[in-house]
Regions:
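N-terminal module-boundary/linker segments of secreted carbohydrate-active enzymes
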Residues: 29-68, 73
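Structural recognition of the beta-strand scaffold that forms the well-ordered cores
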Residues: 48-54, 84-89, 140-145, 210-215, ...
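Aromatic-lined carbohydrate-binding/catalytic grooves of carbohydrate-active enzymes
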Residues: 75-223
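Aromatic-lined carbohydrate-recognition surfaces of secreted/lumenal glycan-active proteins
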Residues: 139-154, 237, 241-258
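Glycan-recognition surfaces
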Residues: 169, 173-175, 187-189, 195, ...
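Carbohydrate-binding surface patches
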Residues: 334, 340-343, 348-350, 384-424
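Catalytic cores of secreted or luminal carbohydrate-active enzymes
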Residues: 335-383
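C-terminal beta-strand-rich structural cap/linker in extracellular carbohydrate-active enzymes
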Residues: 441-463
Length: 463
């Protein structure tokens, strides 16, 4: 046998050994698992995600008992209406819930939940036991993360899992968050930078996380000089897609700029369109402008996010000003839920669920209103006339329209919409969705008296 022939023979023999050993099929299985997870990510959020986030109630100081209590309430009272995500917001890796001392990390600079607040994480279990509990209720589990790598990991120059690099090889110490001293940016143009994000996603996948809220990502060119962190967003998305587990990616904070719309749509399931909003009228009123700008970008698996719902009991822990009920009036709370629904924003309840009051509960369980958020289409601003605003959307499978009427003024006003504006004609029935009441049939137009800072939501037309 000639030397070239011997080489070919041994190559074929080696290939046969590999095939016979099952190594290639195993590798193919892993590839198929990654492909399956990536395909699942493409349809993770066919409708706007709904759930509860701990931040408005507990800041960075929520504990396991409180998360479980809110999860139980969600499962018992809200899951039937579509609420399913339970999200632990920031600083779960600091003992006090504030940037004080060193966070808890593993040997690769990956943050871990503190056991004084999350005792089930002891023994290196991370959030897996808590995720298992949430899943046992039929719900999905999420966590908040900050962009980048912990400053403590850089100071200790910890190794990057799966590489020869260390934290100081991938850090960008000039790339920081204006409102948190926990992290430095990561240079993802370096392979080890991507490897760090890969290691994070694999860790979260091992915990069976379903939802990641990534903060300090999408705000662009604000007075603090922050920029849209496109490379790190793409690196995180890539890491999640190769983690073997489908996970929703939510980007924060806003305002995200329209020039970045294509990128956020490609790399995330939801992204914030404004800065944080709290329970005050000026911030709520400002959301009308943001929603108008982003309406054309609403669609399956990419949802502009108008922020959490600051309803019910807020700021129980983690804030200096103590617990309070939402300062929004009842009319303003109806306006908030009406705008979020006609815009089709994700719905993430911020208030404490076990202490919820009957009025707030009624806002979260009105199936006719929630159907607008989850299943309407063609949502857009119809008109603005002084203090009056109207939005319209299509009712799927019918010729009907959903119509939201708003009064941003300081006194009651009659707000009217004509059939011509809606592309309708004839004598048409109108249903009040908030009051679950048929109002009768009307010719040519419909008008309603709307309270100051108030709203109405209606379904108009024949089925």
């Amino acid at each position: 046998m000639t030397k070239p022939m011997r080489s070919i023979f041994f190559l074929l023999l080696a290939a046969g050994v590999v095939l016979g050993s099952g190594l290639l099929p195993a590798r193919s299985r892993r590839a198929r698992q990654r492909d399956k997870a990536k395909a699942a990510s493409a349809v993770l959020a066919p409708t706007p995600p709904m759930g509860w986030n701990s931040y408005d109630s507990y800041g960075g100081d929520v504990n396991e008992q409180q998360v479980k209590a809110n999860a139980r309430y969600l499962a018992d009272h809200l899951a039937i209406y579509g609420w399913k995500y339970v999200v632990v917001d920031y600083y779960w890796y600091y003992p006090s819930g504030h940037v004080k001392g060193n966070p808890v990390m593993d040997e690769y600079g990956r943050l871990l939940p503190v056991t004084n607040r999350f005792p089930s994480a002891a023994g290196g279990k991370g959030f897996k036991p808590l995720a298992d509990y949430v899943h046992s209720l039929g719900l999905k589990f999420g966590i908040h993360i900050m962009r980048g790598i912990p400053r403590a990991a850089v100071q200790q120059n910890l190794p990057i899992l799966g590489t020869e690099a260390h934290a100081q090889d991938i850090v960008n110490v000039l790339n920081t968050c204006s409102w948190s001293e926990a992290m430095y940016g990561v240079d993802v143009s370096k392979p080890a930078g991507q490897a760090y994000y890969d290691s994070l996603a694999k860790l979260y996948a091992s915990w069976d996380v379903d939802f990641i809220k990534a903060d300090d990502m999408s705000r662009a060119r604000d007075p603090y000089g922050e920029v849209y962190h496109g490379p790190e967003i793409a690196a995180l998305r890539n890491a999640m897609d190769h983690s073997g587990r489908p996970m929703v990616l939510s980007l924060s904070p806003g305002p995200t700029q329209l020039c970045d719309a294509e990128h956020v749509e490609k790399n995330s399931q939801m992204w914030r369109i404004s800065n944080d909003i709290w329970d005050n009228w000026p911030e709520l009123r400002n959301q009308f402008g943001y929603c108008r700008l982003w309406a054309s970008h609403v669609g399956p698996n990419h949802w502009p996010d108008a922020d959490m719902l600051p309803l019910g009991l807020l700021r129980l822990r983690g804030f200096n000003d103590g617990p309070r009920l939402s300062r929004l009036t009842h009319d303003e709370q109806i306006t908030l839920m009406t705008l979020w629904s006609i815009f089709r924003s994700p719905l993430m309840m911020g208030g404490d669920l076990p202490t919820i009051d009957p009025f707030t509960l009624s806002l979260l369980t009105n199936q006719e209103v929630l159907a607008v958020d989850q299943h309407s289409s063609g949502n857009h601003l119809l008109f603005t006339k002084g203090h009056q605003i109207a939005w319209v959307a299509d009712v799927p499978g019918t010729k009907q329209k959903y119509v939201a009427l708003f009064n941003l003024g300081e006194s009651p006003e009659e707000v009217a919409v004509t059939w011509r504006q809606l592309g309708l004609a004839g004598r048409l029935p109108v249903r009040d969705l908030w009051n679950k009441e048929n109002l009768g049939s009307f010719d040519k137009q419909f008008s309603a008296r709307i309270n100051p800072h108030g709203a109405g939501l209606y379904r108009i037309g024949k089925r």
